[in-house]
């Protein structure tokens, strides 16, 4: 326990383990700042952010500014008199006026090994790009996009078949552990902030649904990485008989054919030709249907070798 007045800023499930860790350590979390409640899912039911739920379970006051950069939002946070602000996956850019409020600055927990993968979606992009290692970095925030001085890093391997959901769950715990270590070592005066080398950076922009469209002319391993990095959201997809087909689990194989051509169908999956090699789709979801293992899908949908997956209304694969 540091004894500091801490304001916690975060929104999604990824931030919850870090907030719980602060609470379990007995830290004085004087308020939680999170995004407004928003409609979610098919029913568009208005739901609170996961971080808000955790805060309310522990009786911590919650602020939900629509725009944290507005003067009234900044003054409300200033009125909390924080010694430190901890930020993890908050979802809005913090202005300098807010960063300057706490006595000991603002610490961000970022889900990559900075300076690589600055930006909103580091978990997705490190998998899409075929990385075999990633990690978490704590840093002192400045006005740039994940450009602040680094405090600590902790790395973790990425499994060959691991998707974003699995990596998310592990990294959220890793981030909580690293923040606790960061606070302890800062209190002992053991940490010296390290400048980032901008020459080594790459960016991880926010994911868009259209990023999930599979180009079957690409290499099979590259498409597998895309599927892994897009699962569970926004989802990798193609089209079958002009219907959207989401693809969730695949394995590489050595088949050949026209890109997007269905090579075989069986209990183990649906093999589809790529630009180089092939992919066996093990789990999928056709538009308007449930997510199913390939064998169960084929029991209700008559798919034949020689068919094509590709863009909607296309007569050939992408």
Curated annotation (Swiss-Prot):
MF (Gene Ontology): methionyl-tRNA formyltransferase activity
Residues the entry annotates as binding (6S)-5,6,7,8-tetrahydrofolate: 112-115
Family of this protein: Belongs to the Fmt family.
Top-level enzyme category: transferase
PANTHER family per record: METHIONYL-TRNA FORMYLTRANSFERASE, METHIONYL-TRNA FORMYLTRANSFERASE, MITOCHONDRIAL
Role this protein plays: Attaches a formyl group to the free amino group of methionyl-tRNA(fMet). The formyl group appears to play a dual role in the initiator identity of N-formylmethionyl-tRNA by promoting its recognition by IF2 and preventing the misappropriation of this tRNA by the elongation apparatus.
EC number per UniProt: 2.1.2.9
Keyword Protein biosynthesis among UniProt keywords: yes
Protein name: Methionyl-tRNA formyltransferase
Pfam families hit by this protein: Formyl_trans_C, Formyl_trans_N
Keyword vocabulary terms for this entry: Protein biosynthesis, Transferase
CC per GO annotation: cytosol
Catalyses which reaction(s): L-methionyl-tRNA(fMet) + (6R)-10-formyltetrahydrofolate = N-formyl-L-methionyl-tRNA(fMet) + (6S)-5,6,7,8-tetrahydrofolate + H(+)
Organism: Citrifermentans bemidjiense (strain ATCC BAA-1014 / DSM 16622 / JCM 12645 / Bem) (Geobacter bemidjiensis)
């Amino acid at each position: 326990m540091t004894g500091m007045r801490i304001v916690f800023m975060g929104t999604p499930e990824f931030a919850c383990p870090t907030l719980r860790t602060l609470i379990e350590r007995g830290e004085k979390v004087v308020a939680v700042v999170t995004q407004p409640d928003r409609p979610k899912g098919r029913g568009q039911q208005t739901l609170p952010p996961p971080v808000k739920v955790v805060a309310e379970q522990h009786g911590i006051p919650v602020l939900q500014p629509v725009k944290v950069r507005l003067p009234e939002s900044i003054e409300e946070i200033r009125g909390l008199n924080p010694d430190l602000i901890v930020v993890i996956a908050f979802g809005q850019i913090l202005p300098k006026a807010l960063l300057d409020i706490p006595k000991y600055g603002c610490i961000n927990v970022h889900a990559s090994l900075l300076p690589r993968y600055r930006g909103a979606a580091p978990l997705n992009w490190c998998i899409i790009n075929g990385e075999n290692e990633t990690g978490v970095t704590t840093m002192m925030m400045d006005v740039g996009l994940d450009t602040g001085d680094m405090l600590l890093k902790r790395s973790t391997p990425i499994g060959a078949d691991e998707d974003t959901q699995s990596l998310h769950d592990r990294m959220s715990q890793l981030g909580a552990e690293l923040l606790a270590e960061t606070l302890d070592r800062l209190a002992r005066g053991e940490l010296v902030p390290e400048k980032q080398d901008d020459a080594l950076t790459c960016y991880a922009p926010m994911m868009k649904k259209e990023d999930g469209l599979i180009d079957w002319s690409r290499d099979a391993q590259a498409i597998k990485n895309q599927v892994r990095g897009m699962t569970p959201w926004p989802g990798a997809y193609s089209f079958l008989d002009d219907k959207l087909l989401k693809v969730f689990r695949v394995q590489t194989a050595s088949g050949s054919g026209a890109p997007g051509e269905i090579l075989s169908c069986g209990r183990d999956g649906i093999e589809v030709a790529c630009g180089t090699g092939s992919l066996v789709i093990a789990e999928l979801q056709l538009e308007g249907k449930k997510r199913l293992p390939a064998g169960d899908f084929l029991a209700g949908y008559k798919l034949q070798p020689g068919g094509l997956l590709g863009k909607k209304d296309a007569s050939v694969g992408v």
